[in-house]
Curated annotation (Swiss-Prot):
Broad class of where this protein is predominantly found: cytoplasm
Name of the molecule in the record: Serine hydroxymethyltransferase
Domain of life: Bacteria
Cofactor dependence: pyridoxal 5'-phosphate
Catalytic activity: (6R)-5,10-methylene-5,6,7,8-tetrahydrofolate + glycine + H2O = (6S)-5,6,7,8-tetrahydrofolate + L-serine
Organism of provenance: Desulfitobacterium hafniense (strain DSM 10664 / DCB-2)
NCBIfam families, sorted: PRK00011.1
Residues reported in the UniProt entry to bind (6S)-5,6,7,8-tetrahydrofolate: L121, G125, H126, L127, E245
Alphabetic keyword roster: Amino-acid biosynthesis, Cytoplasm, One-carbon metabolism, Pyridoxal phosphate, Transferase
Record-level GO cellular component terms: cytosol
Compartments where located: Cytoplasm
Family: Belongs to the SHMT family.
Name of the coding gene: glyA
Top EC class of this enzyme: transferase
Alphabetized InterPro entries for the sequence: PyrdxlP-dep_Trfase, PyrdxlP-dep_Trfase_major, PyrdxlP-dep_Trfase_small, Ser_HO-MeTrfase, Ser_HO-MeTrfase-like, Ser_HO-MeTrfase_PLP_BS, SHMT-like_dom
Amino acid sequence: MDYIKEWILPQDPEVAEAIAQEEQRQRYKIELIASENFVSRAVMAAQGSVLTNKYAEGYPGKRYYGGCEYVDIVEDLARERVKKLFGAEHANVQPHSGAQANTAVYFAMLKPGDTVLGMNLSHGGHLTHGSPVNISGMYYNFVAYGVDQVTERIDYDVVRQLALEHRPKLIVAGASAYPRQIDFARLREIADEADSYFMVDMAHIAGLVAAGLHQNPVPYAHFVTTTTHKTLRGPRGGLILCQEEFAKAIDKAIFPGIQGGPLMHVIAAKAVAFGEALKPEFVEYQKRIVENAKVLSETLAEKGFRIVSGGTDNHLMLVDVRSKGLTGKEAEYILDEVGITVNKNTIPYDPASPMVTSGIRIGTPAVTSRGMDTLAMKKIAAAIDIALSEPNEAGAAKARDMVAALCAEYPLYPNLD
């Protein structure tokens, strides 16, 4: 990219080289990590703007620094656009990450030791949903729910049973590796019956929700958190949506509760991404993500891979690689060597450790952003099958050639040299 040569290379060749190498990796490998995506040039430019220079503690119209009149415009644009996008009453666009957004809701509504019901990490949940190694699991009494051992889907009757037994202050829904639709309306019924608050972390599916391809949690949840990247295709960051009655508590939890100055250049990039998501073409893009995931999942199944829960309703799938005599760790390494990037991932009731795993997680947002279609998904499935079924140099060479051909056919940032 020109800016690397023009601005970074003369000042810091070591950093310039690392950025250039990462650019090459993104261009010439197939990105299938479900939580990653490629932002637009407009989002990238906004994040690299002069707004990175501005401190703006507080909120629009109520800052602790002068000179905030223009960053106020940017933050207001981000808030109003995302409220329109999801039909929310209140939005806080300042969280630096999804983890910060989740922590802020806990900080606003819970006291240390309060009971919370959240999805088991090994069944597809997230670290911030009560993992004992995360602050959420250290500060609060999380009770885990998971998926049925046979269907590998959430059993809402079991969730109800746990909720009525433990009477949690908060029920958390959402996942980082769950390939099926989540019934937020049903979970709100359970929360009401248990006299619990209800929070949805829609980080992975926010883009699908915005496009109307997944049930919108906003009408059902007291709080909705998300990242702004992944399927939403914005910059890396977080977001909280809530009902107006909780607005002050949420805003205070972010600032001055757990953060200081907001990252105004990132908020500008969020505003641009929300603007993009409001356009009709974003809906078509999300439809392609889901269609690509379905075809990729079905094609892998045809080639002998077991797909957790039997398929996917969204942008991701979990693939059990034991049928190929491999662990998830081994499969991730083999695929990376041929230019396909995935991540090892536990599958429900996994006998292997989280650092080894029996599965890999695959997602289609990034390849869809490159313009890849269902035919390309079939080619990707073939390359994955060859690489993992023939873990030798001959198989690797075939897979590399297929990856190279796909990357050439669907270039990343083609007009950016």
